[in-house]
Regions:
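Terminal alpha-helical segments
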Residues: 1-132
Length: 132
């Protein structure tokens, strides 16, 4: 069952969308490429970071670069713990993994790592927003 919808310009709705991407990333759907699931892991973090920026009343560009979004969060006065900053490496799944021939196929261990990282980032963002 989908979560309660909120207005699209609220941190709550961005967190809902991040949680939806996490659910998709975790689902090992038969016939799905692992790189497609990793794309959703990246999207989870992107949307969760954007929820934090909205919460801190900061605008953001519609970009996929997690390092840039992390920098914007820190510029808002909120330091990112090292284990959260570590998730910026998921940016590579925003484009390369979605199209044939851009990169090597994702391995099971890489997928599991991406899911763990995005899950950790989403939990941190929820904590920042007090949205448990």
């Amino acid at each position: 069952m989908p979560p309660e919808r909120h207005p699209p310009d609220t941190p709550a709705e961005w967190l809902n969308r991040a949680a939806s991407d996490l659910a998709i990333a975790r689902a090992k759907i038969e016939g799905a490429y692992l790189e497609d699931l990793c794309y959703h892991a990246q999207q989870c973090v992107e949307k969760a970071f954007k929820a934090v920026l909205l919460h801190r009343q900061r605008g953001f560009p519609y970009i996929h670069d997690l390092a840039e979004l992390a920098n914007r969060i820190e510029l808002s006065g909120l330091p990112l713990p090292a284990d959260i900053r570590d998730v910026v490496g998921l940016t590579e799944y925003a484009v390369e993994g979605r199209y044939p021939g851009f990169d090597e196929p994702v391995l099971e261990e890489q997928w599991a790592d991406a899911v763990e990282k995005c899950s950790r980032a989403l939990e941190w963002c929820r904590d920042v927003l007090g949205a448990r």
